[in-house]
Amino acid sequence: YCSYTMEA
């Protein structure tokens, strides 16, 4: 996932 702007 991307934990900075898009989570999942």
Swiss-Prot record:
Keyword Cell division: no
Recorded coiled-coil stretches: none
Keyword Secreted: yes
Record localization: Secreted, Extracellular space
Signal peptide annotation: none
Gene Ontology biological process terms in this record: defense response to Gram-negative bacterium; defense response to Gram-positive bacterium
Tissue: Found in the liquid endosperm contained in green fruit of coconut palms, also known as coconut water (at protein level).
Superkingdom, natural source: Eukaryota
Keywords for the protein's UniProt record, in alphabetical order: Antimicrobial, Plant defense, Secreted
Cellular compartments per GO CC: extracellular space
Function: Has antimicrobial activity against Gram-positive bacteria B.subtilis (MIC=257 ug/ml) and S.aureus (MIC=274 ug/ml), and against Gram-negative bacteria E.coli (MIC=302 ug/ml) and P.aeruginosa (MIC=259 ug/ml).
SUBUNIT field: Monomer.
Protein name, per record: Antimicrobial peptide 3
Phylogenetic placement of the source organism: Eukaryota, Viridiplantae, Streptophyta, Embryophyta, Tracheophyta
